[in-house]
Amino acid sequence: MKGATVTRADLCEAVHEQVGLTRQDCAELVERVLELMCQALERGEQVKLSGFGVFQVRSKRARMGRNPKTGEPAAIEPRRVIGFRASQVMKARVDQALSR
């Protein structure tokens, strides 16, 4: 996997090379895992991957903001957002890799 962004195709190729499944099976596997994660988030559940991190839906309250062009106050409606919190293991691993 090269470049600044890892894509679905990159994940499929890595699974193909390391596990030995066909490229088609790898693509289906990656798609199914991502679909299951999306379904869990749609139900409001957390997706916890041990040693990696937690994806969760968070509620943001209504607040006053500003229109960046005009500077006028603007109401921002309450909404839900998806958040990710990296595990301590992941944080340490990335920190170590980037400090080399």
From Swiss-Prot:
Task: Please give the superkingdom of this protein's source.
Answer: Bacteria
Q: Provide this UniProt record's keywords sorted from A to Z.
A: DNA recombination, DNA-binding, Transcription, Transcription regulation, Translation regulation
A Pfam family this chain is assigned to: Bac_DNA_binding
Asked if the record carries the keyword DNA-binding, the reply is yes
Query: Which biological processes are named by the entry's GO terms?
Result: DNA recombination; positive regulation of metabolic process; regulation of DNA-templated transcription; regulation of translation
What the entry lists under InterPro entries is as follows: Hist_DNA-bd, Histone-like_DNA-bd_CS, IHF-like_DNA-bd_dom_sf, IHF_alpha
A molecular function annotated in GO for this UniProt entry is: structural constituent of chromatin
Gene Ontology CC terms: cytosol
Share what the entry says about its subunit structure, partners included.
Answer: Heterodimer of an alpha and a beta chain.
What family does the Swiss-Prot or TrEMBL record give for this protein? Belongs to the bacterial histone-like protein family.
Which NCBIfam families does the record associate with it? Answer: himA (TIGR00987), PRK00285.1 (NF001401)
Protein task:
This protein is one of the two subunits of integration host factor, a specific DNA-binding protein that functions in genetic recombination as well as in transcriptional and translational control.
Tell me the protein's name: Integration host factor subunit alpha
User: Which species?
Assistant: Phenylobacterium zucineum (strain HLK1)
Organism placement in taxonomy = Bacteria, Pseudomonadati, Pseudomonadota, Alphaproteobacteria, Caulobacterales
